[in-house]
Curated annotation (Swiss-Prot):
It holds the Pfam family TRAM_2. It catalyses: L-aspartate(89)-[ribosomal protein uS12]-hydrogen + (sulfur carrier)-SH + AH2 + 2 S-adenosyl-L-methionine = 3-methylsulfanyl-L-aspartate(89)-[ribosomal protein uS12]-hydrogen + (sulfur carrier)-H + 5'-deoxyadenosine + L-methionine + A + S-adenosyl-L-homocysteine + 2 H(+). Catalyzes the methylthiolation of an aspartic acid residue of ribosomal protein uS12. SMART domains: Elp3. Belongs to the methylthiotransferase family. RimO subfamily. Transmembrane segments: none annotated. This is Ribosomal protein uS12 methylthiotransferase RimO. Residues 149-378 form the Radical SAM core domain. Gene3D superfamilies: Methylthiotransferase, N-terminal domain, Nucleic acid-binding proteins, tm_1862 like domain.
Length: 454
């Protein structure tokens, strides 16, 4: 992590802004591109109006993400900006995009963002650039410059890129390439650098975090990595995208034994019924769901469980959906995200028969969310009358502190909203941990009062 180059004085220097669409893995790519351009002397900022060049880092996971990406591209080309399209849409449509939107100046693939400065130089010379590798192979390490918003106290740390699985609904392996892990040494160096810069929470990400190390160490090595990360002086380390098969006894023990790895388990299970999971090309999962969830709850009573689900997958019958509802009632996840199946060309699910009508899929999603809201509200209410540790991230217009306890991941979960008994300057609390007494809870957020700064 580094701060922007403050020594750039040349008023003729090219101003570059970024527009980001998609997941946190895409965000890390954006931060690396910003760092690389900053290192080369470009004026990198957030002011899209003043920028001569706009890099749109796109998402192509589902149709709605592509639509949002295209809207942004056209918005900036219509404004006369020089637009560089990076990320998953560039990878996905490397032949079509430049033909369909000739105003685009360059494409940069998911395995080519390290070349952004060279691409920029060519664009400034008037070239139309297509810098998209057929198969992405690159993964950035701690040596690649990276700009992280200095107003934030949370950073994502990518431990691996790509995926070797072939889930029927997912196009990510085609967009991100095969799995390639960073070494433990490289990850520890970056984590230490982040901690030294004042980052309070590091979130480990990859496509399948529990598969970390399989490609370079010959076996999944997340437990070994967590043991080393527990020595880094950062208060919270959170793990996203853990799969059931990788949650071994050794991994769970690493969670238990660490003081800074929060007991938050993000498990994208997708479904509960064996028939649907088999159609999703995840046949191994159904037999593990129950045992893994029970094991986590038994061994770590304070564990927070999040999952993501897909409804409306081809062939999902009412009996399959009712099985999923029973599964949710039984296991009472703290947080649930629900997605309606999106048929993606290039995936095996695209040609599956027996598609579920959209109105049924919509109703199933609404049904799950209604059930989950009641579950989440009851679980949140258990915190009323207790004291929790909260990372304060901002102050509202009403002079309330807004932050998170370890029970909430940024962006996808709720917040802890705290009142204070006196007016304060932002720097008194923001970026710090406080102890808070929880007085009220709804289905999304916790509310309380600050007791003291930790």
């Amino acid at each position: 992590m580094k701060q922007s180059n403050k020594n750039v004085k040349d008023k003729n220097i090219t101003k570059v802004a970024f527009s980001h669409v998609g997941c946190e893995k895409n965000l890390v790519d954006t931060e690396h591109m910003q760092g690389l351009l900053d290192k080369e002397g470009y004026e990198v900022g957030n002011n899209l109006e003043d920028a001569k060049v706009v890099v749109v880092n796109t998402c192509s996971f589902i149709e709605t993400a592509r639509e949002e990406s295209i809207r942004k591209i056209l918005e900036f080309t219509d404004q006369g900006k020089q637009v560089i399209v990076a990320g998953c849409m560039a990878q996905h449509f490397k032949e079509e995009l430049l033909k369909e939107i000739p105003e685009i100046k360059a494409l940069v693939g998911t395995g080519d963002y390290q070349k952004i400065a060279k691409v920029m130089n060519r664009v400034e010379k008037g070239e139309i650039v297509n810098e998209v590798s057929k198969v992405p192979e690159f993964i950035a390490d701690e040596k690649i410059p990276r700009l992280i918003d200095q107003k934030k106290f949370v950073a994502y740390l990518r431990i691996a890129e790509g995926c070797d699985y072939n889930c029927a609904f997912c196009i990510i392996p085609k967009l991100r390439g095969p799995q390639r892990s960073r070494t433990i040494e490289s990850i520890i160096l970056e984590a230490t650098n982040l901690a030294n810069q004042g980052i309070q929470e590091i979130i480990l990400i990859s496509q399948i975090t529990t598969n970390y190390g399989q490609d370079i160490y010959g076996k999944p090595s997340l437990a070994r990595l967590l043991k080393e990360l527990s020595k880094v002086s950062v208060p919270w380390i959170r793990i996203h995208y853990a799969y059931p098969t990788g949650l071994t006894d050794e991994v769970i023990k690493a969670f238990k034994d660490s003081n800074n790895i929060v007991p938050y388990f993000d498990l994208p299970l997708q479904h509960s019924h064996s028939d649907v999971l088999k159609s999703m090309n995840r046949p191994w999962q159904a037999s593990l769901n129950e045992s893994i969830l029970s094991k986590i709850r038994d061994q770590i009573p304070s564990a927070v469980l999040r999952t993501s689900l897909i409804v409306g997958f081809p062939g999902e019958e009412q009996k399959h959906f009712l099985h999923l509802l029973d599964f949710l009632h039984k296991h009472k996840f703290d947080h649930v995200g629900v997605f309606i199946f999106s048929p993606e060309e290039g995936t095996s699910a695209f040609d599956l028969p027996n598609r579920v009508p959209s109105e049924i899929a919509d109703a199933r999603k609404d049904n799950i969310m209604s059930i989950q809201q009641n579950i989440s509200k009851k679980k949140n209410q258990l915190y009323v009358g207790t004291k929790v540790k909260v990372l304060v991230e901002k102050i509202s217009k009403n002079n309330e502190l807004i932050g998170r306890s370890y029970h909430f991941a940024p962006e996808i979960d709720g917040n802890v909203i705290l009142s204070i008994k006196k007016n304060v300057i932002e720097n008194n609390y923001v970026g710090k941990f406080v102890e808070a007494n929880i007085c009220f809870a709804d289905e999304y957020d916790l509310y309380g009062e600050v007791i003291n700064i930790l």
